[in-house]
Structures are given as C-alpha cells and as structure tokens.
C-alpha cells in the first residue's frame, strides 16, 4: 500500500511539472522579443526598420513615422554635442540630408530613409543632444515624418534578422575602414591617433572615432551614411 502511495505521489508531481513546463514554454513563445542583436553591444529593436544610411524608421499607429540614428553609429562616433534638425513642414525626398550630429568641430549628416514631410522634431535634442547616445531608439528619436511614398520606400529598408545580418556586414566593413585609416601616413594629418584599436571579434570599441579628425568623419559619412541612399555626394 505504501509503495502504491509513493508511486501515485510521484505520478502526481510529474503531471504537475509537465503542465508547469508547458505553460512556461507557451508564455515564452507568446512573449515579444526585446530585440535582435547583430552583436551583444549593438541593439536592433524588434519592429524597427533600418535604412542603409544607419537611420531607423518606426511606424506609428497614426500613420506617421519616427526616425532616428541607429545604435551602431552613436556608439562608434562618441559623445554628441549638438544636433542640427530640419524645421517642421520641410518636404524631403529619400536620400536628402535630414539631420546632422556634431561633436565639437566635427560632424556627420544623415540621409532621409523615406520621402515625406517633417511634421515634428524632438525639441529635447536641442537642449540635451546626449539623449541620442543614451536612448537612440526611444527618447533619442530625431524627427517625425509624414510619409508620401511609404509602400515603395519600405521595401528598401530591412527589419529583424535581415537587419541584424546587414549590420554584421557593416561591422566587418567598418573594421576594414578604420584599419585603413590607421595606415594613412601621419604626414597627411588625417590618420587616426595612435592607440585606437578594435576589440577581438571584429566589433569596434565604443567611441573609436571620437578622437579622429573631420577628414575621417567625412569619409565615414560618404562610405556609410550616404551610400545606398540615392545621392552621389555627401555634400548634396
């Protein structure tokens, strides 16, 4: 009798454990992922679309889109001292200059990932530009755009795993780019300072461009922020 009681008790616990585990697995399957990451240090939030010029687009319920700069760029350029924004009601075409981040006397400009009209700006960035660095996907958003050709433009953006794969390739490309800059003859005045290195695994260290001259910032803009946006020159 005792043996039967023990066996019955074990069976009861096994059944309870089965349903607990099943419920936990179901909950995990239904819970939304916080983000996908190309590397642990570079975040790609779920549901955000990414342009080739390292801007992101978030579709809002009211039909507007929120635009900002991705985690990759804000980490490698370092602290932001000022943000230059287009005024509200400005009409932009995909690939037009949209906003500029400054660090002292250096700057890089970002292109519009979609066409539309600027209907709002993040005023907080005027007084606290560092928010772009702290919260690039939330409080650090840059502009609100009312899209005019979203159906076509969105096809040229990436999302989720596709965006993560693209960013991995961008990290590799940046590694080659920054390595080439360290090999520029010092006499040219545009080489990276001694001691700037990359972490193992191909990912750049934070702030790797902070102490580089404007010439390298300009090359970075041309190679990474302008390419793929329909503009031939970073100055257009």
Residue ranges, per PLM feature:
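Contiguous, well-folded functional domains in the mature portion of proteins
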Residues: 1-236
């Amino acid at each position: 009798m005792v043996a039967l009681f023990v066996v019955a008790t074990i069976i009861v616990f096994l059944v309870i454990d089965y349903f607990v585990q099943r419920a936990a697995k179901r909950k995990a399957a239904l819970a939304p992922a916080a983000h996908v990451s190309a590397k642990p240090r570079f975040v790609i939030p779920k549901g955000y679309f990414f342009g080739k010029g390292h801007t992101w687009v978030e579709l809002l319920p009211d039909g507007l889109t929120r635009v900002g700069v991705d985690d990759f760029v804000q980490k490698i350029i370092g602290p932001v001292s000022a943000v230059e924004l287009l005024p509200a009601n400005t009409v932009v075409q995909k690939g037009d200059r949209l906003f500029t981040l400054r660090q002292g006397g250096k700057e890089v400009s970002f292109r519009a990932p979609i066409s539309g009209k600027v209907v709002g700006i993040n005023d907080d960035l005027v007084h606290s530009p560092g928010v772009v660095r702290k919260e690039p996907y939330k409080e650090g958003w840059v502009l609100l755009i009312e899209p005019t050709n979203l159906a076509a433009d969105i096809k040229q953006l990436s999302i989720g795993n596709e965006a993560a794969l693209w960013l991995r390739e961008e990290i590799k490309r940046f590694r080659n780019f920054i390595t080439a800059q360290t090999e520029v003859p010092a006499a040219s005045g545009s080489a990276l300072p001694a001691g700037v290195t990359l972490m193992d695994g191909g990912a750049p260290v934070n702030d790797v461009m902070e102490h580089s001259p404007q010439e390298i910032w300009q090359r970075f803009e041309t190679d990474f922020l302008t390419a793929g946006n329909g503009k031939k020159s970073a100055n257009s």
